[in-house]
Amino acid sequence: MSNTKWIGAAAGWFFGGPIGGIIGYYVAKNFFGSKVDNKKAFEISLLILSSIVIKADGKVLKSELDYVKKFFTNTFGATKSNEYFRMFNSLNKQDLTSKLRQVCLQLNSHINHSSRLEIIHFLFGVSASDNEIHPKEIEQIKRIATYMNINP
């Protein structure tokens, strides 16, 4: 199985860019045989962007993690939320900032403007969940907005 996850990552990257690579890796590692669709790619993109914003100030706080988990539970249900949060915990151990632009551009090509605005709103909620909107978090959210063709 150890080679399978890397083959999945390579195939995912080839067909779906950086998001596809991450999805391919996790599908092969955890959900071998599962089919990944645009909805799942969107949901994983939210996790990636959340992780980047959470880590922007150099601290990962429980309140921020709880905010993301609650959002996913309310939006996608408890079972799916638990599945995604296991993935989120793994993503949080990685430095994903180098993939930020590619993830945003890929999202930009698949969702409409109002959905992109909702993502920015969600990310500000993540940032504010610890009762402090750190300037570095704002900087990351502005960068995300710019990459998604939203005037910051």
What are these regions (language model features)?
Residues 1-152:
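Small-residue-enriched hydrophobic alpha-helices in membranes
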